[in-house]
Amino acid sequence: MSVDVAIIMGSQSDWETMRHAAHTLEALGISFDARIVSAHRTPDRLVAFAKGAKAEGFKVIIAGAGGAAHLPGMAAAMTPLPVFGVPVQSKALSGQDSLLSIVQMPAGIPVGTLAIGRAGAVNAALLAAAVLALYDEALAARLDEWRKAQTESVAERPSNEA
């Protein structure tokens, strides 16, 4: 059986952010495989992964990277699959460098770019779920339930509790 979503990241330290995508996919019952694929330190691994991702059965790629953040764009350049880029917060510029690197792709090589950090990772997983749900009614129902539960979890009034 193939795995629907690939979560790739440039280094182990990126997992602190990208695990939020994994947890969201798990909550929705979506299969995924998380891998470290550095555009700079393991370029051959990146090429092999990106060129083979569709044949491996992946349907969507979520790519997280910090700093120069070339991973999402380079993956998108080598695969026909949709790639969602998650800028990982960096120490030097708080992830703004990552965001600009991922979002400024040339015409013809799209990367769906999300917010910096945890919110971006969660939203990348939700976008992947929405794409997959176009062809999976059971997943569409789970995604609807997830959104309903999120809505119901928001209090109507502020609380004095910490």
UniProtKB/Swiss-Prot annotation:
Pfam families: AIRC. NCBIfam families: purE. Catalyzes the conversion of N5-carboxyaminoimidazole ribonucleotide (N5-CAIR) to 4-carboxy-5-aminoimidazole ribonucleotide (CAIR). It is an enzyme of class 5 (isomerase). It comes from the Bacteria. Belongs to the AIR carboxylase family. Class I subfamily. HAMAP family: PurE_classI. InterPro entries: PurE_ClassI (IPR033747), PurE_dom (IPR000031), PurE_prokaryotes (IPR024694). It comes from Brucella suis biovar 1 (strain 1330). One of its GO terms (molecular function) is 5-(carboxyamino)imidazole ribonucleotide mutase activity. Its EC number is 5.4.99.18. This is N5-carboxyaminoimidazole ribonucleotide mutase. One of its GO terms (biological process) is 'de novo' IMP biosynthetic process. SUPFAM superfamilies: N5-CAIR mutase (phosphoribosylaminoimidazole carboxylase, PurE). Pathway: Purine metabolism; IMP biosynthesis via de novo pathway; 5-amino-1-(5-phospho-D-ribosyl)imidazole-4-carboxylate from 5-amino-1-(5-phospho-D-ribosyl)imidazole (N5-CAIR route): step 2/2. Keywords: Isomerase, Purine biosynthesis. It catalyses: 5-carboxyamino-1-(5-phospho-D-ribosyl)imidazole + H(+) = 5-amino-1-(5-phospho-D-ribosyl)imidazole-4-carboxylate. Substrate binds at S11, D14, R41. The keyword Lipid biosynthesis does not apply.
